[in-house]
């Protein structure tokens, strides 16, 4: 007898007698591949969250994440669809690369929505340059030498 079920991740219908599956919860099934992809995505997201929290603790000089910062992070994740790694990179961009001070932060990370797009463009341009120069050998690169001659000024007598 066929047991048709729907994968909760990819939403495709499959027969659980013919394909390997994982029972995610009672009466909820998923392909084995879909479940493993989702599990690895969740592990990566958790690692990104831990890295963000450690960076914020170091940045603001606190011993823990304050409720204000936690609420800001949750707002950015839910309303703006930012990622944990994106928020961390935006903070790194604003405070370390741009060299801004944390004194005006007032114990929060409210600057993130204002610098997120700039940080994204900055890191995207770095990624693009790495992709473009991936197959180039830096040792063989010889810069072109340009000789500029400047005539000495003439004295007016």
Residue ranges with predicted function:
Residues 4-7, 28:
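Residues immediately within or flanking Cys/His clusters that coordinate Zn2+
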Residues 7-10, 34:
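Disulfide-bonded cysteines in secreted/extracellular proteins and peptides
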Residues 13-15, 38:
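Cys/His-rich microdomains that often coordinate metals
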Residues 15-24:
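Canonical RING-type zinc finger of E3 ubiquitin-protein ligases
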Residues 24, 28-82, 146-157:
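Long, charged low-complexity interaction segments
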């Amino acid at each position: 007898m066929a047991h048709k079920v729907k994968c909760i991740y990819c939403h495709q219908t499959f027969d659980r007698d013919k394909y390997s599956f994982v029972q995610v919860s009672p009466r909820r099934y998923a392909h084995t591949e879909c479940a493993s992809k989702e599990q690895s995505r969740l592990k990566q997201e958790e690692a990104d969250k831990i890295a963000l929290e450690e960076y914020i603790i170091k940045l603001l000089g606190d011993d823990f994440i304050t409720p204000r910062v936690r609420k800001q992070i949750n707002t950015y994740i839910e309303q703006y669809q930012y990622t944990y790694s994106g928020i961390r990179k935006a903070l790194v961009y604003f405070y370390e690369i741009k060299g801004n001070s944390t004194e005006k932060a007032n114990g929060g990370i409210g600057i993130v929505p204002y610098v997120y797009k700039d940080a994204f463009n900055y890191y995207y341009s770095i990624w693009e340059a790495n992709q473009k120069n991936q197959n180039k050998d830096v040792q063989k690169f010889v810069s072109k030498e340009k000789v500029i001659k400047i005539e000495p000024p003439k004295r007016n007598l």
